[in-house]
Amino acid sequence: MTRAKSGKISKKRHKKILKLAKGYRGRANNCFRVAIEKVEKGLQYAYRDRRNRKRDFRGLWIQRINAAVREHGLIYSQFMGALKKAGINIDRKVLAELAVNNNDGFASIVQQSKAHI
C-alpha cells in the first residue's frame, strides 16, 4: 500500500492561515509557524472584543446622555427614573443620538420627564 501524502491539504491549510495573517508585521505575515500563533491570538481578541464593544457603546451612550441632561439641570439617574415614570420607552442609543444631533427634540423629552420627578 502506498503512503498517503497530504501535500495539497497542507498547502491549502497554510494558504488559508497566511491569508488571514495578511497585513501582520515581521515574520507573522509570511512564516507559517509564527503566523498561526498570531492568527489564533487575533481571533481570540476579535471574539473578546465583539462582546466588549456592546459594553463600551452602552457606556458611551450613558456619558452622552448624562452630559446633555446636566445642561438641563438634572442628573442621569434622575432623568432615567423620570422617563420610566412618564412611560417614555426610548433606549439609550436613541437618546444619545438625539442628545448629540437634535437638541430641540432632546430638550422636549427632558421637559416631559421633569414633570414626573
Swiss-Prot record:
GO terms for molecular function: rRNA binding; structural constituent of ribosome. One of its GO terms (cellular component) is ribonucleoprotein complex. GO terms for biological process: ribosomal large subunit assembly; translation. InterPro entries: Ribosomal_bL20 (IPR005813), RIBOSOMAL_L20_CS (IPR049946), Ribosomal_protein_bL20_C (IPR035566). The keyword Ribosomal protein applies. CDD domains: Ribosomal_L20. Gene3D superfamilies: 6.10.160.10, Ribosomal protein L20. It comes from the Bacteria. Keywords: Ribonucleoprotein, Ribosomal protein, RNA-binding, rRNA-binding. PANTHER family: 39S RIBOSOMAL PROTEIN L20 (PTHR10986). Binds directly to 23S ribosomal RNA and is necessary for the in vitro assembly process of the 50S ribosomal subunit. It is not involved in the protein synthesizing functions of that subunit. Belongs to the bacterial ribosomal protein bL20 family. This is Large ribosomal subunit protein bL20. It comes from Rickettsia prowazekii (strain Madrid E).
